[in-house]
Amino acid sequence: PKGALRQTVLCKNGTIPAPLPARVSTFASPDDKTGACKVGQRTRWQGANGANCTVEQFCLEQYAMQGFRGYHSEGGIIKFLFVLLMWDVLFLPIPGAFETPYQRAPMDLGTDVFVIARQNAIEKQLQCIRDTGGLDIIQRVDSRERPQKTYAMGCRWDEFSLPTLLEIAECLG
């Protein structure tokens, strides 16, 4: 289905997965006896074990059969990688950005002021990522912050390990 993999990350030696097989037998019937889906109700698919599952789980199972490993995280992995890569920029001591040491993010994040106040630091960090690929930055920040499980937006320390994050970042390029 269109958009089924929009938030799913797949990786296998930098290769692109083959399209999913279009077999009608893989779809679970909707709960409705008419065969129609109810408005607002998610479609259900038949998973590898025969039980109903979400379209995301179905896709991950199909790609796993091709040797790929994947994650469905609704953008959580990308957000986590962004925060690790831009940590030093996000947490610069900009006046007014932090009122308490318990904030998950600077108060000006998502505003024009955020970029204006950090323009040089942002450009420098992006150039560093272009030059090195950023894996070293992810490693450094993760190794420093993970032991304390620093409370920061997008950081899901218990959900994604450093090796997993590095592998995904490398696959994304």
What label would you give each PLM region?
Residues 5-173:
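Nuclease catalytic cores
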